[in-house]
From Swiss-Prot:
<keyword id="KW-0689">Ribosomal protein</keyword>
<dbReference type="GO" id="GO:0022627">
    <property type="term" value="C:cytosolic small ribosomal subunit"/>
</dbReference>
<keyword id="KW-0694">RNA-binding</keyword>
<keyword id="KW-0699">rRNA-binding</keyword>
<dbReference type="InterPro" id="IPR001971">
    <property type="entry name" value="Ribosomal_uS11"/>
</dbReference>
<keyword id="KW-0687">Ribonucleoprotein</keyword>
<comment type="subunit">
    <text>Part of the 30S ribosomal subunit. Interacts with proteins S7 and S18. Binds to IF-3.</text>
</comment>
<dbReference type="InterPro" id="IPR018102">
    <property type="entry name" value="Ribosomal_uS11_CS"/>
</dbReference>
<dbReference type="GO" id="GO:0019843">
    <property type="term" value="F:rRNA binding"/>
</dbReference>
<dbReference type="GO" id="GO:0003735">
    <property type="term" value="F:structural constituent of ribosome"/>
</dbReference>
<dbReference type="InterPro" id="IPR036967">
    <property type="entry name" value="Ribosomal_uS11_sf"/>
</dbReference>
<dbReference type="GO" id="GO:0006412">
    <property type="term" value="P:translation"/>
</dbReference>
<dbReference type="Pfam" id="PF00411">
    <property type="entry name" value="Ribosomal_S11"/>
</dbReference>
<comment type="function">
    <text>Located on the platform of the 30S subunit, it bridges several disparate RNA helices of the 16S rRNA. Forms part of the Shine-Dalgarno cleft in the 70S ribosome.</text>
</comment>
<comment type="similarity">
    <text>Belongs to the universal ribosomal protein uS11 family.</text>
</comment>
<dbReference type="InterPro" id="IPR019981">
    <property type="entry name" value="Ribosomal_uS11_bac-type"/>
</dbReference>
<protein>
    <recommendedName>
        <fullName>Small ribosomal subunit protein uS11</fullName>
    </recommendedName>
</protein>
Length: 131
């Protein structure tokens, strides 16, 4: 019988970071939350799909709220107390995600920016759906 090669999981090193940036990427299908330090190094992240929401439930505002709460609870373990928010995308979880960051106890929101890319008449958009 052959020996199985088992790799050990990486141990998460607790960082002591007081100020961070929350990136909220709200697409039509999912919501991604990434929390970084001020230099852009990722502290933790969470997605609606990663929390067990499948299919069309991933794009709901409730799923976005749960993703934010999951990511911020991980960030609090690293000592994050103040955050800025950068929002990208047109998804339905966008507003709810911003509100739930502000409502989280122990986290102070310093600023909110919209970083959604807008084309200056760039690529031709895809044709309209006919249902």
């Amino acid at each position: 019988m052959a020996k199985r090669n088992v790799t050990a999981k990486k141990k998460v090193v607790k960082k002591n970071i007081a100020r961070g940036v929350v990136y909220i990427s709200a697409t039509f299908n999912n919501t991604n939350i990434t929390i970084t330090d001020e230099m852009g190094n990722v502290i933790c992240w969470s997605t609606a799909g990663g929390l067990g929401f499948k299919g069309s439930k991933k794009s709901t505002p409730y799923a976005a709220q749960q993703a934010v709460e999951s990511a911020l609870s991980k960030a609090k373990e690293h000592g994050v107390k103040e955050v800025g928010i950068k929002v990208q995308g047109p998804g339905s979880g966008r507003e709810t995600a911003i509100k739930s960051v502000g409502a989280t106890e122990g986290i102070k929101v310093l600023w909110i920016k919209d970083i959604t890319p807008l084309p200056h008449n760039g690529c031709r958009p895809p044709k309209r759906r006919r249902v």
